[in-house]
Amino acid sequence: APNVDDQSLLHTGDWPFGRTNHYFFDLNRDFFLLTQPETRGRVALINTWRPQIMIDGHEMGSQSTFLMGPPRQPLNTNIDTDLQKWAVTFSEEQGAAFDKRSWRYFTGEWFENWYPGYSNYSEYRGSMHILYEQSRMAEDGVRRPEGTVQTYMESVHHQFVSTMANLESLATHSQAMYRDYWDGRKYNVSAKSKFADKSYVILANDNHGRMAALVERLDAPVSYTHLTLPTKVT
């Protein structure tokens, strides 16, 4: 018989498994730290392919409904305002797909966009990041407080419709998004950018292997100096 009680073992994950690698490290916190081999592989693909959008489809507590963007404050100030604008557009069009089917959802509430170690790392490379979370149903579905049973098939349908809505939005707005991307990248390397004429100094210590590993992971132009240079600490 189906077990729709979300307190049962069927609906309970085996801690700490589920979202960690075999080192028990949460890979959805590692995107800019790059401590894990899986993360370094993901980031290398993002930096190589530079996708226009990156979708992160999650699950959450079974007694919730469906979370979609845009995120709430605080927002990281290093994220381009154009990406924030498009996040609102995509969310509204995804929400319209849910409204059409009378599905419950909420937006702009509990998840913020400050920490760059989530999959939203893609936004710092110019790609729009989309997160949504479906209440977890497992195999048999879950009885909700009002007495209805939401099935696993319904939860998959929500994720599928969300993805298709995002792809339809991308097809509609792709050219305008490319123009914003080009303008933003061009500005960021211009003399007017807040990043213009800036260098970052890392003081070396006796652990040369650790320094070499950091340089490799940064994948950025690096030079070494043995001179004493004046610096301004900010």
Which residues are covered by each model-predicted region?
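Active-site/substrate-binding loop(s) of hydrolase catalytic cores
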Residues: 1-88
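Divalent metal-coordination and catalytic microenvironments
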Residues: 27, 55, 132, 163, ...
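Long, well-ordered, tryptophan-enriched scaffold segments
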Residues: 103-105, 118-125
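Phosphate/diphosphate-binding loops
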Residues: 110
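Mobile "lid/hinge" segments at catalytic clefts and subdomain interfaces of large enzymes
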Residues: 126, 131, 135-139, 153-157
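Catalytic cores of secreted or luminal carbohydrate-active enzymes
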Residues: 143-187
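Extended non-catalytic domains of envelope/secretory-pathway proteins
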Residues: 196-224
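Conserved small/polar residues in nucleotide/adenosyl-binding loops
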Residues: 225-231
